[in-house]
Amino acid sequence: MTNIRKTHPLTKILNNTFIDLPTPSNISSWWNFGSLLGLCLIMQILTGLFLAMHYTPDTSTAFSSVAHICRDVNYGWFIRYLHANGASMFFICLYAHIGRGLYYGSYMFQETWNIGVLLLLTVMATAFVGYVLPWGQMSFWGATVITNLLSAIPYIGTTLVEWIWGGFSVDKATLTRFFAFHFILPFIITALAAVHLLFLHETGSNNPTGIPSNMDMIPFHPYYTIKDILGALFLILTLLALTLFAPDLLGDPDNYTPANPLSTPAHIKPEWYFLFAYAILRSIPNKLGGVLALLLSILILIFIPMLQTSKQRSMMFRPFSQLLFWTLIADLLTLTWIGGQPVEHPYIIVGQLASILYFFLILVLMPTVSLIENKLLKW
């Protein structure tokens, strides 16, 4: 008798996705981040659901409702900090996942890659609207500054900003709609993640060498289920350590002050995971130019497959490309640091140089070095 796992319409889908899925035999721990992102998403939806049971999306009570969650709700403080730090873990996994894709040439699966870029944008939007909800100083001013960037769009900009705000400033209507967006977007992310997996399983996974994977495949279960569980344990351990020992390490102290439209914080800055893009935005003195650079810093990922000039898919055997890749990572870390600094000398010039280097590396240096490496293959 055939196993019900392989015949029942529902279990058949799960079986072909998580159990009998043919997987390359040599994928490293860098391939763990996909499942970790799934775990992060589930944790964020669950903790968010419990927070939403006690939160009130109203300007007069939002801040105190978060304080109420932390003080009066059973384990409310724990759920709140799991959710806040869970977002940080989400972005760490997300950036590692994208970095792995860049390093090993996974972007050559173009449909999977493009859905991935769309997922990144959706997660960033979710994190942004979520940061506004506690209605602290940084929530309010972050929302004001970032939504105001849309006013740089010629002709329709100001109208668009007021339409998003639901008034002439960030107020009650803005908070209510941001809560609605923050609630619905994770479910859209879940649907997109399913499509992401669908496209991935059409081609099968890439592997560190970059050569076709169908030479040597093994079933996903038990080999990679056990490996993913190990990764998940590391993730949960890190998240718990962060939540229980240093819950405010990655947050901003200004957000413990209730939102006040009459008092601007000394340094308005987003959460750490947006700082690299914020630094690129600030490095251009022109408003529209800055907004375009900000958009391009993320959307440049869509053009990566078109910039592939190497005959080899992976960087595993390309030392010069490896050097440039790690230079790019160092540059992104520099931008992250600059994004958190005040706008003064020497941070301004460092930010401008790091921004130029970011685009120059991706658009010029990496494709050129790949062509040189192609020549070296013939030696």
UniProtKB/Swiss-Prot annotation:
Binding site for a ubiquinone: H201
GO BP annotations, alphabetical order: mitochondrial electron transport, ubiquinol to cytochrome c
PROSITE patterns: CYTB_CTER, CYTB_NTER
Mode of membrane association: Multi-pass membrane protein
Gene Ontology molecular functions: metal ion binding; ubiquinol-cytochrome-c reductase activity
Disulfide bridge partners, by residue number: none
InterPro entries: Cyt_b/b6_C, Cyt_b/b6_C_sf, Cyt_b/b6_N, Cytb/b6-like_sf, Cytochrome_b, Cytochrome_b_C_euk/bac, Cytochrome_b_N_euk/bac, Di-haem_cyt_TM
Transmembrane feature ranges: 33-53, 77-98, 113-133, 178-198, 226-246, 288-308, 320-340, 347-367
Family label: Belongs to the cytochrome b family.
Name the record gives this protein: Cytochrome b
Species the sequence originates in: Cephalorhynchus eutropia (Chilean dolphin)
